[in-house]
């Protein structure tokens, strides 16, 4: 697995440098459009300043912002022991040094993501809807996928690559809007004095590059994002030795009709499945943040003989119908056999699903500081945190209960 991580880091560096070159060239061209004599270097300086500020904000507070925007709340082990145990199992299986924090998102839409640019401050967040639908094997598959993103340093890379992309888009938009809102007159009057022709050429090039640079950067970013989803699936199979768990989880996520209202275009690439489903169907493969979920499921269900990377690579090529180097050759040299395990977890029935849905609702109430009283009649009384009285009557049997503050 370490070969895959190293290869991932090399490719990440190449992409990061490529996006950096696009950012620098964009800054130089736009700066030259303002002033052909030395303006290009000023443009590069300001482009790097913008990127640096956004990077610092992301490094120190990015995870907090993402979790807050997603309405995710941190939970302790007593709130959901099974989820904590699974995260801990996958942390041990992956050989990761630090235990990620665990968050639950208050949404009925099943989904999950991982975040954290610093190795000692990572987090795995799952929705209440995911907990309501999945059995243990399926939940383990999802957590293993997210743990793979952390171990492979995808979270770090996608965060800073996303900032680079955001800087390119921001600078381009500011430049184009400045032209739209009356900037053109200033350029014309200036160009009529001395280097009119040179500035006009730079202006045409700048407009074209300001339009094309964000598109090129996004296509590159999305292509790498899609590939990393495949690699996280492959690593999850290696960690769990049970591809059907993740395949079944992805199937249930895909079948869900609930909308994840807290997701947006910025946070969408972080999730295990595209949360913007209604928009995602209209997009081509080039502009999608995730590979087709049906294809991911077919690959997982075609894995045979073992849970090694080479087994995933074989299934990947079979479904794609062509040879394609998804996993670096250095990671395929491991000849040790990792056998697939058989599931001992039963599928959810209609009754058990209802029970889990109620439990997921109770979890979110517990996270939001509700307290619970189990009445002898079998009713669980849920008391909101702002309830002021010292006693409460059971709405079913009328029994009086004291409230311990």
List where the protein language model places each region.
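A broad structural signal for alpha-helix termini and local helix breaks/kinks
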Residues: 34, 94-95, 240, 304
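Generic structural signal for hydrophobic residues
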Residues: 83-87, 232, 246
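Residues within alpha-helical segments
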Residues: 88, 233-237, 297
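Cytosolic-facing loops and C-terminal tails of multi-pass membrane proteins
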Residues: 197, 201-223, 239-405
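A Zn2+-metalloprotease active-site environment signal
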Residues: 1-75, 100-142, 150-242, 248-265, ...
């Amino acid at each position: 697995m370490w070969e895959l991580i190293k290869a991932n880091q090399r490719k990440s560096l190449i992409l990061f440098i490529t996006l950096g070159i696009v950012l620098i060239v964009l800054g130089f061209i736009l700066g030259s459009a303002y002033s052909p004599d030395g303006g290009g270097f000023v443009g590069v300086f300001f482009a790097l300043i913008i990127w640096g500020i956004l990077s610092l904000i992301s490094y120190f507070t990015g995870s907090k912002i993402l979790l807050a925007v997603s309405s995710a709340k941190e939970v302790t082990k007593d709130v959901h022991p099974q989820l904590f145990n699974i995260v801990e199992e996958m942390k041990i299986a992956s050989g990761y040094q630090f235990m990620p924090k665990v968050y639950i998102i208050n949404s009925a839409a099943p989904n999950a993501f991982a975040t954290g640019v610093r190795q000692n401050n990572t987090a795995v967040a799952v929705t209440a809807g995911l907990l309501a639908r999945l059995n243990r094997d399926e939940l383990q598959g999802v957590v293993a996928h997210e743990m793979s993103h952390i171990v492979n340093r995808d979270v770090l890379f996608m965060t800073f690559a996303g900032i680079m992309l955001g800087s390119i888009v921001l600078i381009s938009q500011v430049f184009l809007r400045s032209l739209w809102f009356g900037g053109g007159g200033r350029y014309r009057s200036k160009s009529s004095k001395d280097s009119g022709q040179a500035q006009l050429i730079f202006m045409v090039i700048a407009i074209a590059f300001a339009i094309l640079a964000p598109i090129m950067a996004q296509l590159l970013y999305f292509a790498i994002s899609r590939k990393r989803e495949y690699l996280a699936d492959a690593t999850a199979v290696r960690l769990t030795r049970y591809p059907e768990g993740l395949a079944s989880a992805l199937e249930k996520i895909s079948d869900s009709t609930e909308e994840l209202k807290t997701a947006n275009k910025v946070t969408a690439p972080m999730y295990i499945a595209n949360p913007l489903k209604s928009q995602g169907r209209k997009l081509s493969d080039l502009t999608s943040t995730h590979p087709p979920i049906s294809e991911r499921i077919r690959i997982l269900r075609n894995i045979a003989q073992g849970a090694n990377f080479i087994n995933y690579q074989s299934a990947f090529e079979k479904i794609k119908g062509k040879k394609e180097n998804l996993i670096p050759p250095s990671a395929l040299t491991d000849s040790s056999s990792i056998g697939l395990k058989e599931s001992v977890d039963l599928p959810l029935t209609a009754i058990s699903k209802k029970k889990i849905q109620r439990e997921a609702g109770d979890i979110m109430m517990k996270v939001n500081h509700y307290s619970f009283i189990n009445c002898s009649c079998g009713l669980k009384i849920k008391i909101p945190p702002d309830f002021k009285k010292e006693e409460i009557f059971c709405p079913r049997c009328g029994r009086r209960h004291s409230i311990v503050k």
